[in-house]
Amino acid sequence: MFWIAKTLIAFLILLKTDCYKIAIPANLIDEVNPVLEFVDFRVQVIPYETKPLWRIKQESFKIVGISIENGLFSVCNCLILGASAIILPEQYDGHLAAAAIVQSIADNTNVPCVSLHLSPPTRPSTHLHPHLNAKSLAVAAFIKREKWKDVVVVFEEPDELLEITDMITAGHFDPDSFSSQLVRLKHGDDYGNELKHIKNKLDRYRIVINIPLQKALHFLEQAANMSMCGVLYHYVVMDMDLVTVDIDSIRGIEDCNITSFGVHDVNSEYIEDIRQEIVHKSSIRLPKKGVPYTTSIWIDTLRLLIRSMKSIQIWDEPRCGSSWKSGSDIKKRFFENPLAGISGDLHWAPSGERSNYTLHVYRRTLSFQKFAEWSSRTRRIASSEAVVIANSSEKLTLEGKHLKISVYLEAPFVMITSNGSYEGYCIDLLHKIANILKFTYTIQKVRDNAYGSKESNGKWSGMVGELQRGDADLAVASLTISYGRSEVIDFTVPYMHLGISILFKKPRIRDSDWFKFMDPLSTQVWIMTFASYFVVSVAIWIIAKISPYEQFERDEDNGQYKPVDNQFSLRNSFWFTVCSLMQQGSELCPRAASTRLLTGIWWFFALILISSYTANLAAVLTTRRMETPIENADDLAAQTKIKYGTLGRGSTMSFFNESKIETYERMWQLMSSSPGLFVQSSKEGIARVKSSDYAYLMESSMLEYAVERDCELMQIGGLIDQKGYGIGLPKGSPYRELISTAILRLQEKTELTELKEKWWKDKSVVCEQPKRKDQDDGESIGGIFIILVVGLVLTAVLVIFELITTRKPSPAQSQVIRHVNVIPSFKLGFFRWNVN
């Protein structure tokens, strides 16, 4: 145990005349041997003309231990054996002193020393890793490219926190517009508490994971079990080997949206060719895609060292205490001999570090696909044309996916049957879309029974909130597309167009009205007509009194004027105008031009009035009209008797709240001042309309459904606004275009129209409509008979009054009285004639 704790295991490439010898740590012999087998194969294919092919033989491998107490002797002993290069191991934590000894001796003797460790020891050594903060810079560039405003960064060890600090520093993020939250994981494999904290407390959906690969996979698997996958959540995994993992084999992670990085393009033909060589010529175990990061660094390091040594003539051997001349040549060739390595093109900076390297950026929705590259030279992420073309060849599909569907119960869109299953317009629509795109789904009712509105704490309720939190993949309901919602979720194209309208109860058809013949003219017109009749009658009487042509008549024989009786007495004037109004003739005829002018104007007035009355009377008597106290939203806003309101949440309420139109502003002021005007459901609003003087402002689609099934309800006016229903998806969902295309396809085939006909039209309900009447039953004009009877009675009373008030009969009256005695003779003659 003491030896393990105090010993650094170094890999020594030993130079002999017939082979290279390499010392390998005992605990890594099984891992490294396959790599050396592959390098042996790669060296064999390098042609040389001046000397025979040098080979690496597995049986020549040797283990060399360098202790801290005896470090100088151990290294010098290795050099005596002919070591031509030293490779420091991948891990030497706790042995920094021994590593420093090896590095110092290598520098003094000029023996090439290459480190497999990501970070160099106290003295810089040559290594093939990208810079220590390369991943941090790449992640920072990705966050800025995506314009994220907040992230959660997950880590476990202090050195991982150091990389995160580098990331935040390198990003130069504006503290006013960007925030990050650090979450340190406890040791172990259970991350449930940390995930609950992220989901419920932090309420953030962009998570950077900087932990080892296996731990990262456990973290993602547990996140998937807590419904923290899907297009809403986005994970950035900093481990370089994630892209080589068959992630679809891990339950639940296949739905996670993940971005990761790698040193090579796992989908390139070059990497695939190398993979095939490794598989066929060695026992290295490789994943299904790409080459693991550590393996690629191993292979590139050995290949570059061997190529550098084989490119020169080595005449001397290294010795402790002296500088090895051939070592300088090997180092020079090492940096001057570029290599297209598995870990990328190898270029070097003067400091001995890699430069001009590229990290490939992968995004996973269906599978890991390269979509961009990060360059160490520009420190930016850019999508090359080749990457764009490659990505365009990947066909996005929902086939085989299983989606969680959030629904809101609202007839006829979504309803529950007696056996607990769902039905309705939206359910049929979802089924048709699923058949087109070949996905399966599970339906879940929205927990808080709301469409979704922004709360005072900035969070969204209802289906919108579930999409934001990742609790649902789709929201399929009568979900209105609005500006506020579209800022936090995505919508498909509208599957139905609609607007806000007014639901009101039908007025009762007025019972039999014997004075209906007065309806063609309003009360005001009747009053004005009688007033005109009185004024014109008096005017004719006055003008006739004044005009000389109504007092005298020209004698045609001698041309002299002789006085005559004025025919337009006050009584005759009223009689004359009423005869004209009733379009009847009279024995009176005006003589003067003034009276004739007034008479002509009165006749014109009577003509228009009677014509209008006749036309309106025909319509009134043939159709039973239902009179409503309001005709549109303006009428509703202008009165106070009929109360009105909307659903207490949702887009209709938001429309009136945000409207700048004066009428709707007044309506909102009234509604907001009386919270009792709002209802909790459309069912409650409809019941309130039927039971009281209440108008319910609702979306026309549900209004049509209610009117179709209840003959007591009706729509008032047209649409107040124009909008549409769409299917909701999480923001940035790649499936929006697929589902929108499916909706357009159904629309083109008129299947959406058929669905509406199916769910809106109720053939069992037939509402009686006002009908035209071919015959009048007398109910509408019975009043004229009443007027006739009253007129006869008044006439009889009047004639009796005239007889009583006249003391001495005039000659004419006496003649009439005498004629009364002949009535019996008239009756007798009538009966005789009838008998004959």
Swiss-Prot record:
State the UniProt keywords alphabetically.
Answer: Cell membrane, Disulfide bond, Glycoprotein, Ion channel, Ion transport, Ligand-gated ion channel, Membrane, Postsynaptic cell membrane, Receptor, Sensory transduction, Signal, Synapse, Transmembrane, Transmembrane helix, Transport
Binding site residues for L-glutamate: S478, L479, T480, R485, S651, T652, E699
Q: List the disulfide bonds.
A: C76-C320
| Keyword field contains Membrane | yes
Q: Which residues are glycosylated?
A: N225, N257, N356, N391, N419, N657
The knockout note for this entry states:
Abolishes signal transduction during cold signaling in intestine and ASER neuron.
Extent of the signal sequence = 1-19
Instruction: Write out the topological domains of type Extracellular.
Output: 20-523, 622-780
* Any single biological process term in GO: detection of temperature stimulus involved in sensory perception of pain
Cellular component GO terms held in the UniProt record:
plasma membrane; postsynaptic density membrane
Q: How does it sit in the membrane?
A: Multi-pass membrane protein
One of the record's GO molecular function terms: glutamate receptor activity
Protein name as annotated: Glutamate receptor ionotropic, kainate glr-3
The gene that this protein is the product of is glr-3
